[in-house]
Amino acid sequence: MTARRILVTSALPYANGQIHIGHLVEYIQTDIWVRFQRMMGNEVYYVGADDTHGTPVMLRAEKEGITPKQLIDRVWTEHKRDFDSFLVSFDNYYSTDAEENRELCEKIYLALKADDLIAEREVEQFYDPVKNMFLPDRFIKGECPKCGAKDQYGDSCEVCGTTYVPTDLKNPYSVVSGATPVRKSSTHFFFKLSDPRCETFLREWVADLAQPEAANKMQEWLGSEGEASTLSDWDISRDAPYFGFEIPGAPGKYFYVWLDAPIGYYASFKNLAEKKGIDFDAWVGPHSTAEQYHFIGKDILYFHTLFWPAMLRFSGYRTPTNVFAHGFLTVDGAKMSKSRGTFITAQSYIDTGMNPEWLRYYFAAKLNASMEDLDLNLDDFIARVNSDLIGKYVNIASRAAGFLVKRFEGKVDEAALAHPLLKQLREAAPQVAQLYEAREYSKALRLVMELTDTVNAFVDTEKPWELAKDEAKRSALHAACSVSLEAFRLLTVYLKPVVPTVAAGVERFLNVEPLDWRAIDKQLSASSPVQAYQHLMTRVDAKQVDALLAANRESLQATAPAAGAAAAASIEPIADTITIDDFAKIDLRVAKIVECQKVEGSSKLLQLTLDLGEGRTRNVFSGIQSAYTPEQLVGKLTVVVANLAPRKMKFGVSEGMVLAASAADEKANPGLYILEPHSGAVPGMRIG
């Protein structure tokens, strides 16, 4: 069979912070798939890079008193260290602040411009008169134009969920300097995604997406065929000062970070190609027969399934074969939290003495091909790793290897290796391979653990420790140990993409060549004696997990005594007096949260399905994702403004407002708290 040629990427981590376990979901998912493809004999290149450009990097470097280049170089070293620690096997890990990336950005931009897909338009933005810079959405705060909530970002309100443009904010201020921004016009460059050519191409391209959720979301963005396109042109430029690449022929204008970041995939591969003599154009040209896959989080699906393929298609490059999106990580059913210690950094995990392959295995046991979220339940983590990897898998080798080495010089009984058990294990290979290929890791490991149970049942039946007591049963002991270790070798082939370091240890003590998928059709040989058994993995100790949480838990003790005073200081002044008639216009009702889910493309909103006792349910968007997971809210009672006029939002129509409490200065006193009526209240009850 002809080997496949595959280019694989993971999303680029931003060069403004540490790698944490939420990031690692994606890199471990990708790495398992890449390692499996290598074991299958395919030509695979896995490339990545740090995403280095943009205002946040520029401002952080300024705050630290260093240059942006010094900052991104330091962060690159930290990120590379963390990926190496978790056995993420990049063929090349690079930076978007590289000459290859500059050249590719300019080439793609000029090709799009030549094809009349770049437009220039005047844009009015907020400008910081102190810092002399235009302000991105996240660097402006003010009062929500809809509900009046203070300290809301420039793109949406976390209290009521309304989305808006920054210039809609009331009493805006610059997060950078605190100054009141002024409105200022500037010429910006847009990629014309609304061009009919882009729409036609994207409708064809979406048909090949593997994930139904991704295809459905694309259809939402594209709208029904024959209707007016819902696609909007994309602002690809930013004004100086900006850390990034200047746009050719446009002094003081820079490529927006989201343009040069995905192009960074190609820049990293080009850097690798130049070092290894790979024909770059043969892999990424429009007629390439290679495959190209992007593993990403579902929050950046929009960029990778609309802008990125359209940019490639109309600038003379091949388009992705597929995009694979995964869900978000929760810990013990809740968002990662610094106060609880569950915002776990990669480095703290390693520093605590935790084995990276424990986490690789646990994530693999939870991952599938969908975009659903996954939860790291710490008690389950301890139990599953200790049960599956230690109690079941490693236990096989520890029960058989010693006898084979001591009694038989490590030489297997080759005649015994015709045992039906081994045939059963080999017959599972196509199914295991199919599940790895489809990214259904949880199903693959479930099957492997079922096979492991079968092997352990064989060992329990044969009882080599009993056979060893009777010299007359020497041949039976030899056969039992030989079959057990050959079974262990086959199981190791199946687990190698997930636990490569353990697999390397197995290869050493079994005295075999590095295991790939073809090794399934081979077997242990008496001419290559098994070596003395070396311990492969230790059990997870609950005390280690406690220490990990403690290492990541922010100390609240120092701030606790002043918490009350701080909260009091942040209380907003009481609003102007209203009459009872004014209040009577507001219809507050008890509502039951029937369903709840995160809103695709929003880091703030939750979509709630509410029962107000009307005989139907209502759809309400609420900006409380920072405080609650969907699982925490389903089944709860809350309070809703029931007679608020429905409003059309970016993500749908909201038919009410969930009431929540927060401090006036959420930065100083973070936290959102939905209102809950006492037990006994039922949906539909009026509050007054």
Swiss-Prot record:
The enzyme's E.C. designation: 6.1.1.10
One Pfam family in the UniProt entry: Anticodon_3
A GO molecular-function descriptor: metal ion binding
Binding site for ATP: K338
GO biological process annotation, one example: methionyl-tRNA aminoacylation
InterPro entries from the UniProt entry: aa-tRNA-synth_I_CS, Anticodon_Met, Met-tRNA-synth_bsu_C, Met-tRNA_ligase_1, Met-tRNA_synth, Methionyl/Leucyl_tRNA_Synth, MetRS_core, MetRS_Zn
Superkingdom: Bacteria
Keyword ATP-binding: yes
UniProt-annotated location(s): Cytoplasm
Chain residues that bind Zn(2+): C144, C147, C157, C160
Motif ('HIGH' region): 13-23
Keyword Cell membrane carried by entry: no
Cofactors that this protein relies on: Zn(2+)
Keywords attached to this entry: Aminoacyl-tRNA synthetase, ATP-binding, Cytoplasm, Ligase, Metal-binding, Nucleotide-binding, Protein biosynthesis, RNA-binding, tRNA-binding, Zinc
Cofactor note: Binds 1 zinc ion per subunit.
Domain tRNA-binding positions: 582-688
Reactions mediated catalytically: tRNA(Met) + L-methionine + ATP = L-methionyl-tRNA(Met) + AMP + diphosphate
A single Gene Ontology CC term: cytosol
Motif 'KMSKS' region, chain ranges: 335-339
Subunit structure: Homodimer.
PANTHER family: METHIONINE--TRNA LIGASE (PTHR45765), METHIONINE--TRNA LIGASE, CYTOPLASMIC (PTHR45765:SF1)
Function text: Is required not only for elongation of protein synthesis but also for the initiation of all mRNA translation through initiator tRNA(fMet) aminoacylation.
Family per similarity comment: Belongs to the class-I aminoacyl-tRNA synthetase family. MetG type 1 subfamily.
Designated name of the protein: Methionine--tRNA ligase
